[in-house]
Amino acid sequence: MKKIFTFLLFSQISYAQEAPRYLFDDLYFADPSAHVFNNKIYLYPSHDIDTEVKDPTNGGHYNMKDYHVLSLDHIGQKKTKDHGTVLKLEDIPWAEKQLWAPDVAEKNGKFYLYFPAKDKEGNFKIGVAVSNKPEGPFTAEKKPIKGSYSIDPAVFKDNGKYYIYFGGLKGGQLEKYRDNEPLAQAKEPNDQENALSPKIALLSQNMLEFAEKPRDIQILDEKGNPLKAGDHDRRFFEGVWIHTYNKKYYLSYSTGDTHKLVYAIGYNPYGPFTYQGEILTPVTGWTTHHSIVEIDHKWYLFYHDSKPSGGKNHLRSLKVRKLEYDEKGFIKTMNGQD
Ligand code: FUB
């Protein structure tokens, strides 16, 4: 009897540690990029709003108009702090609409917010806004990053250099480009062709420009062949994130129309990366988008789902849960319906 009780107690405690929790109830946020700055956890999410745009084609109903910054003093804190609006669409000279998933990097005490938005011609570009504080407010540069396109910037610091990763299919417009040049018409590769890749570029010293032409990131299967466009369970769709663990580089992303978070492992920021498996099975809602961060020697997955809005794809809520590796360094798959 004592044994059973001890087992139940232990399993309850361990379940409580693993279970995800929602981070914010009052407003809808999504696509959280989490970072530890000055010993605090900062979250840079998209700010979802209900919208008059009813047609979901190409993500038009993700019609966000501003960014907020959220923070936690520690991971267990019950109420996430909202620092309020830190950048508005109307204060970005070049942007017309759709402030999608952002990320932030710190360099020499300044904070750089990277964000996608559609310009006046309806093309997604990536902009930068700068602040002296992690919680903003941020001031946008007058123009987007020269040569930028598509969505979902994620900035990664490695050996003193900063790299920007980006790209997203369909609504994210990656099919409109080849070799960094716009096509006359968007063209999807056919199923047997190589899948479109996320992009990477070194950032300039001042963090405001690409210091090189964006390059393709190769994601390979177990035989060393690039993943094919028809491989919807494994190929890149959007929402790339990169982190290191035991000196290896983990590139994680959403598979979009199959709604999974998956990852691939490489040995430097440019790759190639070899596909490994699923991090998170589909959540409630069409999109899945995440970040992975080490906090106090433990690893966490920040993500979103649409359960609290009753499954409305464009009204998403932030979540966090512990992420675990097995003894070989593979990420243990988590259930998106938890
Ligand atoms: O939030 C708008 C878009 O939905 C993001 O940019 C994508 O990653 C997807 O989550």
Please provide the spans of the model-predicted regions.
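Carbohydrate-active catalytic/glycan-binding domains of CAZyme proteins
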Residues: 16-338
